[in-house]
Amino acid sequence: MGLNRLMLAKKTTASGGSTADNTFTVTIGQQGYQYGFSRYNATIGEVEGNVQHEGKAVTLVMLCYYSGYLDFAFTIEGVSSGKRNVTVKLTLVDNGTSGTIEFPKIDYQSYVPGFYEYTRNLTSDVIRMFSKANVGKKIKVEIIFN
């Protein structure tokens, strides 16, 4: 099948205008001690843009850090079962701080509904991205479908 990459990022005005097709802009939000973006059991942060994978719309549901855990969830239009192997690369747009997170087996969870997994296996750079100091800042998220 090959390597499929989705860029979830902001295209700046200097490089051609508003948010480009197949990209997201994620703005870090906060609710209590929870930081990131979520539309599952909370409304935190913002995301905009249009992303497709294999011709189907992808929706970011959650990229949220709380108490040592990073929750990650997304949906693929028309898909309601199965599992994926994805790598998520995060880059804080302000200063270029980045980190990579592996989700080798992210299963579809009907209660979300969507592909959902959490991890505690995070670098200190990733942990620092999700902090009070970065609320309102932009984060670039690259999802690599392996």
PLM features: residue spans?
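Transition segment at domain starts
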Residues: 23-61
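Beta-rich globular "head" domains
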Residues: 48-86, 90
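Solvent-exposed serine/threonine-rich low-complexity stretches and specific carbohydrate-binding patches
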Residues: 99-113
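Aromatic sugar-binding surface patches on proteins
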Residues: 112-125
